[in-house]
Amino acid sequence: MEMGRRIHLELRNRTPSDVKELVLDNCRSIEGKIEGLTDEFEELEFLSTINVGLTSVANLPKLNKLKKLELSDNRISGGLEVLAEKCPNLTHLNLSGNKIKDLSTIEPLKKLENLKSLDLFNCEVTNLNDYRENVFKLLPQLTYLDGYDRDDKEAPDSDAEGYVEGLDDDEEDEDEEEYDEDAQVVEDEEDEEEEEEGEEEDVSGEEEEDEEGYNDGEVDDEEDEEDVGEEERGQKRKREPXDXGEDDD
């Protein structure tokens, strides 16, 4: 899927100014450039374009509020001065798996005064002698390089991804609200179904009672007939001796 198309889908009926987080991983860039992204995304704080075939960030729009930029697994080899111009408030930058070979390529990042974390995993520059020491000298504002500070202490997850988690929490709250609404609808439907079932049970119960009553009536009638028959037979037996006596006379 092309990047422009992917951005359109990610908007999901929102306006660009409503978007704080945009993930475009694994889509396809045209001619290795960013497309479809404009300065209308003025509230954007997190942008991820992992493995999209980028060779340049020249088309990156002005994103003053962008804090974290994921550019890993692309083919970027230079032109990073654009980042200082277009994303002046970057705090986290991931360039892992790109074609960065020497320190001069990352030197323009000195202008990113708020840059706190830089990742260059799987870039050729990491093979240079005294790589870490030289990068920290070149970019004194850095706290973490490839996930570790100057003393080789690992960056805590909360520091690296805290504000992104905050964005996720907001989205989860929205999802929970939607879920609650859906759940209420389902509950209402279930209540209606239960009421209908209850009414059906009442009707069937009445029918059963009527049938039982009808059957009981038949049994009572039969018993009454039997009683009448026995009485008649008794009367006959009583009359027979009397009749015999009259004959004797």
From Swiss-Prot:
Q: InterPro entries given for it?
A: AN32 (IPR045081), Leu-rich_rpt (IPR001611), LRR_dom_sf (IPR032675), U2A'_phosphoprotein32A_C (IPR003603)
Which portions of the sequence form the region Disordered? 147-249
> What's the protein called, per UniProt?
Acidic leucine-rich nuclear phosphoprotein 32 family member A
Region named Interaction with E4F1? 165-249
User: Basic and acidic residues compositional bias: what residue ranges?
Assistant: 147-156
Record's subcellular location: Nucleus; Cytoplasm; Endoplasmic reticulum
Its taxonomic placement starts with:
Eukaryota, Metazoa, Chordata, Craniata, Vertebrata
* Domain LRRCT span(s) in chain numbering: 123-161
